[in-house]
Amino acid sequence: MREIVHIQGGQCGNQIGAKFWEVISDEHGIDPTGTYHGDSDLQLERINVYYNEATGGRYVPRAILMDLEPGTMDSVRAGPFGQLFRPDNFVFGQTGAGNNWAKGHYTEGAELIDSVLDVVRKEAEGCDCLQGFQITHSLGGGTGSGMGTLLISKVREEYPDRIMETFSVVPSPKVSDTVVEPYNATLSVHQLVENADECMVIDNEALYDICFRTLKLTTPTYGDLNHLVSAAMSGVTCCLRFPGQLNSDLRKLAVNLIPFPRLHFFMIGFAPLTSRGSQQYRALTVPELTQQMFDAKNMMCAADPRHGRYLTASALFRGRMSTKEVDEQMLNVQNKNSSYFVEWIPNNIKSSICDIPPKGLKMAVTFVGNSTAIQEMFKRVAEQFTAMFRRKAFLHWYTGEGMDEMEFTEAESNMNDLVSEYQQYQDATAEEEGEFEEEGEQ
Protein backbone atom coordinates (compact mmCIF):
# COMPACT_ATOMS: atom_id res chain seq x y z
CA MET A 1 0.00 0.00 0.00
CA ARG A 2 1.01 3.63 -0.03
CA GLU A 3 3.51 3.82 2.80
CA ILE A 4 4.92 6.94 4.38
CA VAL A 5 8.29 7.09 6.11
CA HIS A 6 8.18 9.50 9.03
CA ILE A 7 11.37 11.25 10.17
CA GLN A 8 11.66 13.54 13.17
CA GLY A 9 14.76 15.63 13.86
CA GLY A 10 15.94 17.82 16.71
CA GLN A 11 14.15 18.60 19.95
CA CYS A 12 11.10 20.27 18.46
CA GLY A 13 10.69 17.65 15.72
CA ASN A 14 10.92 14.81 18.19
CA GLN A 15 8.39 16.34 20.54
CA ILE A 16 5.87 17.01 17.78
CA GLY A 17 6.58 13.59 16.34
CA ALA A 18 6.03 11.84 19.66
CA LYS A 19 2.66 13.56 20.05
CA PHE A 20 1.76 12.72 16.46
CA TRP A 21 2.32 9.02 17.08
CA GLU A 22 0.10 9.20 20.16
CA VAL A 23 -2.70 10.65 18.04
CA ILE A 24 -2.25 8.21 15.15
CA SER A 25 -2.00 5.20 17.46
CA ASP A 26 -5.18 6.29 19.16
CA GLU A 27 -6.96 6.53 15.79
CA HIS A 28 -5.85 3.06 14.79
CA GLY A 29 -6.58 1.49 18.15
CA ILE A 30 -2.99 0.68 19.01
CA ASP A 31 -1.85 0.72 22.62
CA PRO A 32 1.61 1.79 23.88
CA THR A 33 2.95 -1.75 23.50
CA GLY A 34 2.02 -1.91 19.83
CA THR A 35 -0.91 -4.29 20.32
CA TYR A 36 -4.18 -3.67 18.53
CA HIS A 37 -7.24 -3.05 20.73
CA GLY A 38 -9.54 -1.43 18.22
CA ASP A 39 -13.20 -1.85 17.48
CA SER A 40 -13.36 -1.70 13.69
CA ASP A 41 -11.67 -3.51 10.81
CA LEU A 42 -11.21 -0.17 9.11
CA GLN A 43 -8.53 0.69 11.63
CA LEU A 44 -6.35 -2.15 10.38
CA GLU A 45 -7.24 -2.08 6.70
CA ARG A 46 -4.51 0.35 5.72
CA ILE A 47 -2.51 0.48 8.90
CA ASN A 48 0.66 -0.15 6.93
CA VAL A 49 0.71 3.45 5.72
CA TYR A 50 2.41 4.34 9.01
CA TYR A 51 3.17 1.02 10.71
CA ASN A 52 5.17 -2.10 10.02
CA GLU A 53 3.83 -5.36 11.38
CA ALA A 54 6.34 -7.19 13.55
CA THR A 55 6.27 -10.72 14.92
CA GLY A 56 3.46 -11.53 17.31
CA GLY A 57 1.15 -9.03 15.65
CA ARG A 58 2.88 -5.96 17.09
CA TYR A 59 2.60 -2.76 15.10
CA VAL A 60 5.75 -0.67 14.95
CA PRO A 61 5.75 2.93 13.68
CA ARG A 62 7.70 3.50 10.48
CA ALA A 63 9.46 6.36 12.25
CA ILE A 64 13.07 7.46 12.35
CA LEU A 65 14.15 9.60 15.27
CA MET A 66 17.32 11.63 14.94
CA ASP A 67 19.02 14.20 17.12
CA LEU A 68 22.54 15.36 17.85
CA GLU A 69 22.12 14.94 21.59
CA PRO A 70 20.52 12.10 23.53
CA GLY A 71 18.30 14.22 25.82
CA THR A 72 15.08 14.53 23.88
CA MET A 73 15.17 10.93 22.74
CA ASP A 74 15.49 9.74 26.29
CA SER A 75 12.34 11.65 27.16
CA VAL A 76 10.53 10.25 24.11
CA ARG A 77 11.58 6.78 25.22
CA ALA A 78 10.33 7.47 28.71
CA GLY A 79 7.10 8.99 27.37
CA PRO A 80 3.74 7.20 27.14
CA PHE A 81 4.38 5.66 23.71
CA GLY A 82 8.16 5.37 24.03
CA GLN A 83 8.22 1.57 23.86
CA LEU A 84 6.36 1.62 20.57
CA PHE A 85 9.33 2.71 18.47
CA ARG A 86 11.92 0.39 17.07
CA PRO A 87 15.12 0.78 19.11
CA ASP A 88 17.35 0.65 16.00
CA ASN A 89 15.56 3.68 14.60
CA PHE A 90 16.87 6.03 17.27
CA VAL A 91 19.92 7.70 15.75
CA PHE A 92 21.66 10.26 17.91
CA GLY A 93 25.00 11.93 18.51
CA GLN A 94 26.43 13.12 21.80
CA THR A 95 27.66 16.63 21.07
CA GLY A 96 24.54 18.62 20.22
CA ALA A 97 24.34 21.28 17.55
CA GLY A 98 24.04 24.14 20.03
CA ASN A 99 21.44 26.01 17.93
CA ASN A 100 24.06 26.31 15.22
CA TRP A 101 22.83 25.56 11.69
CA ALA A 102 26.37 25.02 10.44
CA LYS A 103 27.02 22.33 13.05
CA GLY A 104 23.85 20.53 12.00
CA HIS A 105 24.42 20.88 8.27
CA TYR A 106 28.18 20.67 7.84
CA THR A 107 30.09 19.31 10.81
CA GLU A 108 28.31 17.34 13.54
CA GLY A 109 25.26 16.52 11.44
CA ALA A 110 27.32 15.46 8.45
CA GLU A 111 29.06 12.83 10.59
CA LEU A 112 25.78 11.33 11.73
CA ILE A 113 23.86 11.61 8.46
CA ASP A 114 25.06 8.32 6.98
CA SER A 115 23.73 6.28 9.86
CA VAL A 116 20.39 8.10 9.51
CA LEU A 117 20.32 7.37 5.78
CA ASP A 118 20.99 3.68 6.47
CA VAL A 119 17.88 3.52 8.62
CA VAL A 120 15.88 5.48 6.02
CA ARG A 121 16.99 3.03 3.34
CA LYS A 122 16.09 0.05 5.49
CA GLU A 123 12.59 1.43 6.09
CA ALA A 124 12.10 2.42 2.44
CA GLU A 125 13.19 -1.00 1.21
CA GLY A 126 10.61 -2.66 3.42
CA CYS A 127 7.88 -0.65 1.72
CA ASP A 128 5.59 -2.06 -0.90
CA CYS A 129 4.94 1.19 -2.72
CA LEU A 130 6.53 4.15 -0.98
CA GLN A 131 4.41 7.29 -1.22
CA GLY A 132 6.89 9.67 0.33
CA PHE A 133 8.52 11.08 3.42
CA GLN A 134 7.19 13.37 6.10
CA ILE A 135 9.60 15.26 8.30
CA THR A 136 8.88 17.17 11.50
CA HIS A 137 11.51 19.73 12.51
CA SER A 138 11.97 23.33 13.54
CA LEU A 139 13.84 25.95 11.56
CA GLY A 140 15.13 27.98 14.48
CA GLY A 141 17.50 25.52 16.15
CA GLY A 142 20.55 23.68 14.91
CA THR A 143 19.66 20.01 14.45
CA GLY A 144 16.14 20.18 13.02
CA SER A 145 17.08 23.03 10.72
CA GLY A 146 20.67 22.23 9.73
CA MET A 147 20.67 18.46 9.84
CA GLY A 148 17.01 18.27 8.84
CA THR A 149 17.66 20.13 5.58
CA LEU A 150 20.82 18.09 4.98
CA LEU A 151 18.76 14.92 5.30
CA ILE A 152 16.09 16.30 2.98
CA SER A 153 18.63 16.99 0.27
CA LYS A 154 20.24 13.55 0.65
CA VAL A 155 16.89 11.73 0.59
CA ARG A 156 15.94 13.87 -2.40
CA GLU A 157 19.02 12.64 -4.25
CA GLU A 158 18.20 9.03 -3.57
CA TYR A 159 14.41 9.15 -4.04
CA PRO A 160 13.86 12.00 -6.53
CA ASP A 161 10.33 10.95 -7.49
CA ARG A 162 8.92 10.52 -3.98
CA ILE A 163 6.99 13.26 -2.23
CA MET A 164 8.93 15.14 0.44
CA GLU A 165 6.61 16.80 2.90
CA THR A 166 7.81 18.80 5.88
CA PHE A 167 6.09 20.15 8.97
CA SER A 168 8.36 23.06 9.78
CA VAL A 169 8.10 25.13 12.93
CA VAL A 170 9.19 28.64 12.06
CA PRO A 171 10.52 31.14 14.62
CA SER A 172 7.58 33.16 15.84
CA PRO A 173 7.49 36.97 15.88
CA LYS A 174 7.28 37.68 19.62
CA VAL A 175 8.46 34.45 21.22
CA SER A 176 12.11 33.76 20.52
CA ASP A 177 14.06 30.85 21.94
CA THR A 178 17.45 31.68 20.47
CA VAL A 179 19.10 34.83 19.24
CA VAL A 180 20.39 33.26 16.02
CA GLU A 181 16.96 31.99 14.90
CA PRO A 182 16.80 34.36 11.90
CA TYR A 183 20.10 32.96 10.57
CA ASN A 184 19.08 29.33 11.03
CA ALA A 185 15.63 29.89 9.55
CA THR A 186 16.86 31.77 6.48
CA LEU A 187 19.51 29.15 5.73
CA SER A 188 16.84 26.45 6.10
CA VAL A 189 14.26 28.15 3.87
CA HIS A 190 17.01 28.46 1.26
CA GLN A 191 17.22 24.64 1.31
CA LEU A 192 13.49 23.94 1.58
CA VAL A 193 12.66 26.06 -1.46
CA GLU A 194 14.89 23.83 -3.57
CA ASN A 195 14.49 20.38 -2.03
CA ALA A 196 11.07 19.93 -0.44
CA ASP A 197 7.75 19.34 -2.22
CA GLU A 198 5.35 20.63 0.41
CA CYS A 199 6.12 22.58 3.58
CA MET A 200 3.43 22.99 6.17
CA VAL A 201 4.41 26.09 8.09
CA ILE A 202 3.64 26.19 11.79
CA ASP A 203 4.61 28.68 14.41
CA ASN A 204 4.42 28.63 18.16
CA GLU A 205 2.89 32.05 18.58
CA ALA A 206 -0.09 31.22 16.39
CA LEU A 207 -0.50 27.96 18.31
CA TYR A 208 -0.39 29.84 21.63
CA ASP A 209 -3.05 32.22 20.30
CA ILE A 210 -5.32 29.32 19.36
CA CYS A 211 -4.85 27.85 22.84
CA PHE A 212 -5.65 31.15 24.59
CA ARG A 213 -8.40 32.49 22.35
CA THR A 214 -10.21 29.45 21.10
CA LEU A 215 -9.44 26.66 23.53
CA LYS A 216 -9.46 29.05 26.53
CA LEU A 217 -6.44 27.41 28.14
CA THR A 218 -4.81 29.69 30.70
CA THR A 219 -1.35 28.13 30.66
CA PRO A 220 -0.82 26.13 27.46
CA THR A 221 2.09 23.70 27.51
CA TYR A 222 4.16 22.52 24.57
CA GLY A 223 2.11 19.33 24.80
CA ASP A 224 -1.04 21.32 24.02
CA LEU A 225 0.63 23.06 21.09
CA ASN A 226 1.95 19.81 19.70
CA HIS A 227 -1.46 18.24 20.03
CA LEU A 228 -2.88 20.90 17.71
CA VAL A 229 -0.17 20.20 15.17
CA SER A 230 -0.73 16.44 15.35
CA ALA A 231 -4.44 16.87 14.74
CA ALA A 232 -3.68 18.68 11.51
CA MET A 233 -0.93 16.22 10.56
CA SER A 234 -3.25 13.28 11.04
CA GLY A 235 -5.87 15.01 8.88
CA VAL A 236 -3.50 15.47 5.96
CA THR A 237 -2.95 11.74 5.60
CA CYS A 238 -6.29 10.37 6.79
CA CYS A 239 -7.39 9.67 3.22
CA LEU A 240 -4.48 7.28 2.84
CA ARG A 241 -5.33 5.48 6.05
CA PHE A 242 -9.11 5.22 5.97
CA PRO A 243 -11.61 4.71 3.16
CA GLY A 244 -13.35 7.83 1.86
CA GLN A 245 -15.70 9.14 -0.78
CA LEU A 246 -13.18 11.55 -2.23
CA ASN A 247 -9.62 10.47 -1.67
CA SER A 248 -6.53 12.57 -1.58
CA ASP A 249 -2.90 11.69 -0.98
CA LEU A 250 0.37 13.60 -0.68
CA ARG A 251 0.88 13.74 -4.43
CA LYS A 252 -2.67 14.84 -5.21
CA LEU A 253 -2.28 17.49 -2.55
CA ALA A 254 0.91 18.72 -4.18
CA VAL A 255 -0.56 18.75 -7.68
CA ASN A 256 -3.61 20.70 -6.57
CA LEU A 257 -1.86 23.15 -4.29
CA ILE A 258 1.34 24.13 -6.07
CA PRO A 259 0.81 26.37 -9.11
CA PHE A 260 4.52 27.30 -9.29
CA PRO A 261 7.25 25.00 -8.03
CA ARG A 262 8.88 27.39 -5.56
CA LEU A 263 5.62 28.43 -3.92
CA HIS A 264 5.06 25.36 -1.79
CA PHE A 265 4.75 26.83 1.71
CA PHE A 266 1.30 26.18 3.13
CA MET A 267 -0.71 27.43 6.07
CA ILE A 268 -2.59 24.74 7.92
CA GLY A 269 -5.64 24.87 10.12
CA PHE A 270 -7.91 22.44 11.90
CA ALA A 271 -11.57 22.64 12.89
CA PRO A 272 -13.56 22.19 15.08
CA LEU A 273 -11.56 23.76 17.89
CA THR A 274 -13.65 24.57 20.96
CA SER A 275 -12.88 25.07 24.59
CA ARG A 276 -13.71 22.07 26.76
CA GLY A 277 -16.57 23.88 28.47
CA SER A 278 -18.45 25.03 25.40
CA GLN A 279 -18.31 21.82 23.39
CA GLN A 280 -21.86 20.74 24.14
CA TYR A 281 -23.29 24.07 22.98
CA ARG A 282 -22.12 23.69 19.41
CA ALA A 283 -23.62 21.71 16.59
CA LEU A 284 -21.09 20.38 14.13
CA THR A 285 -22.30 21.14 10.64
CA VAL A 286 -20.46 21.47 7.37
CA PRO A 287 -21.17 25.24 7.15
CA GLU A 288 -19.93 25.71 10.71
CA LEU A 289 -16.73 23.76 9.99
CA THR A 290 -16.16 25.68 6.78
CA GLN A 291 -16.58 28.98 8.55
CA GLN A 292 -14.11 28.11 11.29
CA MET A 293 -11.67 26.57 8.86
CA PHE A 294 -11.29 29.78 6.86
CA ASP A 295 -11.10 31.94 9.97
CA ALA A 296 -7.76 33.73 10.22
CA LYS A 297 -7.60 32.93 13.95
CA ASN A 298 -7.54 29.27 13.05
CA MET A 299 -4.29 29.34 11.07
CA MET A 300 -1.32 27.68 12.71
CA CYS A 301 1.17 30.22 11.43
CA ALA A 302 1.45 33.92 12.16
CA ALA A 303 0.43 35.31 8.79
CA ASP A 304 -3.02 36.73 8.17
CA PRO A 305 -4.67 35.26 5.06
CA ARG A 306 -6.76 38.43 4.77
CA HIS A 307 -3.59 40.34 3.90
CA GLY A 308 -3.04 38.23 0.80
CA ARG A 309 -4.93 36.02 -1.59
CA TYR A 310 -5.26 32.27 -1.82
CA LEU A 311 -3.62 30.80 -4.88
CA THR A 312 -5.08 27.41 -3.96
CA ALA A 313 -6.52 25.67 -0.93
CA SER A 314 -7.49 22.19 0.09
CA ALA A 315 -10.12 21.08 2.58
CA LEU A 316 -9.78 17.55 3.91
CA PHE A 317 -13.08 16.68 5.59
CA ARG A 318 -13.50 13.73 7.93
CA GLY A 319 -16.72 12.08 9.05
CA ARG A 320 -20.06 11.11 7.53
CA MET A 321 -21.36 14.04 5.52
CA SER A 322 -22.95 14.73 2.20
CA THR A 323 -20.58 15.38 -0.68
CA LYS A 324 -23.12 17.73 -2.18
CA GLU A 325 -23.16 19.88 0.93
CA VAL A 326 -19.37 20.07 0.98
CA ASP A 327 -19.29 21.15 -2.66
CA GLU A 328 -21.96 23.78 -2.05
CA GLN A 329 -20.11 25.20 0.94
CA MET A 330 -16.85 25.36 -0.97
CA LEU A 331 -18.50 27.22 -3.85
CA ASN A 332 -20.22 29.46 -1.36
CA VAL A 333 -16.90 30.42 0.28
CA GLN A 334 -15.35 31.21 -3.07
CA ASN A 335 -18.29 33.31 -4.24
CA LYS A 336 -18.68 35.30 -1.05
CA ASN A 337 -14.98 36.00 -0.56
CA SER A 338 -13.92 36.13 -4.18
CA SER A 339 -11.48 38.98 -3.49
CA TYR A 340 -9.41 36.63 -1.32
CA PHE A 341 -8.91 34.10 -4.12
CA VAL A 342 -6.90 34.80 -7.25
CA GLU A 343 -9.31 34.92 -10.16
CA TRP A 344 -6.88 33.39 -12.65
CA ILE A 345 -7.21 29.95 -11.04
CA PRO A 346 -10.94 29.13 -11.20
CA ASN A 347 -12.31 26.64 -8.63
CA ASN A 348 -9.12 26.73 -6.65
CA ILE A 349 -10.33 24.78 -3.61
CA LYS A 350 -9.83 21.04 -3.68
CA SER A 351 -11.91 19.06 -1.23
CA SER A 352 -11.66 15.48 -0.10
CA ILE A 353 -13.81 13.48 2.27
CA CYS A 354 -12.70 10.64 4.50
CA ASP A 355 -15.41 8.63 6.26
CA ILE A 356 -13.71 8.11 9.60
CA PRO A 357 -13.64 11.15 11.92
CA PRO A 358 -10.92 11.68 14.56
CA LYS A 359 -11.43 10.16 18.02
CA GLY A 360 -14.23 11.86 19.94
CA LEU A 361 -15.60 13.97 17.08
CA LYS A 362 -18.48 13.45 14.65
CA MET A 363 -16.80 15.41 11.89
CA ALA A 364 -13.68 17.49 11.46
CA VAL A 365 -11.74 19.21 8.74
CA THR A 366 -8.08 19.94 8.06
CA PHE A 367 -7.32 22.97 5.98
CA VAL A 368 -4.21 23.42 3.85
CA GLY A 369 -3.92 26.73 2.05
CA ASN A 370 -1.38 28.23 -0.32
CA SER A 371 -1.78 31.93 0.39
CA THR A 372 0.40 34.80 -0.75
CA ALA A 373 0.08 36.22 2.78
CA ILE A 374 2.73 33.79 3.95
CA GLN A 375 5.25 36.28 2.62
CA GLU A 376 4.65 38.26 5.84
CA MET A 377 6.39 35.50 7.71
CA PHE A 378 9.37 35.36 5.36
CA LYS A 379 9.62 39.17 5.40
CA ARG A 380 9.70 39.17 9.17
CA VAL A 381 12.52 36.63 9.32
CA ALA A 382 14.38 38.44 6.53
CA GLU A 383 14.27 41.74 8.40
CA GLN A 384 15.72 40.17 11.53
CA PHE A 385 18.32 38.39 9.42
CA THR A 386 19.41 41.59 7.68
CA ALA A 387 19.63 43.52 10.93
CA MET A 388 22.15 41.04 12.34
CA PHE A 389 23.94 40.21 9.11
CA ARG A 390 24.66 43.85 8.33
CA ARG A 391 26.76 44.00 11.49
CA LYS A 392 28.04 40.44 10.93
CA ALA A 393 26.81 39.61 14.45
CA PHE A 394 27.29 35.99 15.58
CA LEU A 395 28.79 35.09 12.19
CA HIS A 396 31.97 33.65 13.68
CA TRP A 397 29.98 30.69 15.03
CA TYR A 398 29.09 29.76 11.47
CA THR A 399 32.33 30.61 9.68
CA GLY A 400 34.16 28.67 12.39
CA GLU A 401 32.38 25.54 11.17
CA GLY A 402 33.63 26.18 7.64
CA MET A 403 30.77 28.23 6.23
CA ASP A 404 31.29 31.14 3.89
CA GLU A 405 29.60 34.54 4.14
CA MET A 406 28.63 34.05 0.52
CA GLU A 407 26.20 31.35 1.61
CA PHE A 408 24.41 33.80 3.88
CA THR A 409 24.11 36.33 1.08
CA GLU A 410 22.71 33.68 -1.26
CA ALA A 411 20.18 32.48 1.30
CA GLU A 412 19.10 36.06 1.96
CA SER A 413 18.54 36.85 -1.70
CA ASN A 414 16.73 33.56 -2.29
CA MET A 415 14.30 34.40 0.49
CA ASN A 416 13.79 37.92 -0.85
CA ASP A 417 13.11 36.46 -4.30
CA LEU A 418 10.52 34.17 -2.75
CA VAL A 419 8.77 37.13 -1.14
CA SER A 420 8.64 39.06 -4.40
CA GLU A 421 7.32 36.00 -6.26
CA TYR A 422 4.45 35.77 -3.79
CA GLN A 423 3.82 39.49 -4.19
CA GLN A 424 3.86 39.26 -7.98
CA TYR A 425 1.15 36.59 -8.02
CA GLN A 426 -0.87 38.44 -5.39
CA ASP A 427 -1.04 41.48 -7.68
CA ALA A 428 -1.58 39.53 -10.91
CA THR A 429 -5.04 39.67 -12.48
CA ALA A 430 -6.64 37.31 -14.97
CA GLU A 431 -6.86 39.62 -17.96
CA GLU A 432 -4.55 42.55 -17.66
CA GLU A 433 -5.11 43.53 -21.30
CA GLY A 434 -8.84 42.80 -21.10
CA GLU A 435 -9.51 45.67 -18.71
CA PHE A 436 -8.62 48.37 -21.22
CA GLU A 437 -10.88 46.93 -23.91
CA GLU A 438 -13.88 47.05 -21.60
CA GLU A 439 -13.24 50.71 -20.81
CA GLY A 440 -13.17 51.53 -24.51
CA GLU A 441 -16.52 49.85 -25.14
CA GLN A 442 -18.51 51.80 -22.55
Curated annotation (Swiss-Prot):
- Entry-linked SUPFAM superfamilies: Tubulin C-terminal domain-like, Tubulin nucleotide-binding domain-like
| Cofactor(s) needed by this chain | Mg(2+)
Q: What is its main location?
A: cytoplasm
Q: Which PROSITE patterns match?
A: TUBULIN, TUBULIN_B_AUTOREG
Name one process (GO BP) from the record: microtubule cytoskeleton organization
Q: Does the keyword Metal-binding apply?
A: yes
Q: Where does Mg(2+) bind?
A: E69
What is stated as this protein's family in its record? Belongs to the tubulin family.
The record's note on quaternary structure and interaction partners says: Dimer of alpha and beta chains. A typical microtubule is a hollow water-filled tube with an outer diameter of 25 nm and an inner diameter of 15 nM. Alpha-beta heterodimers associate head-to-tail to form protofilaments running lengthwise along the microtubule wall with the beta-tubulin subunit facing the microtubule plus end conferring a structural polarity. Microtubules usually have 13 protofilaments but different protofilament numbers can be found in some organisms and specialized cells.
What name does UniProt use for this protein?
Answer: Tubulin beta chain
* Organism this protein belongs to: Paramecium tetraurelia
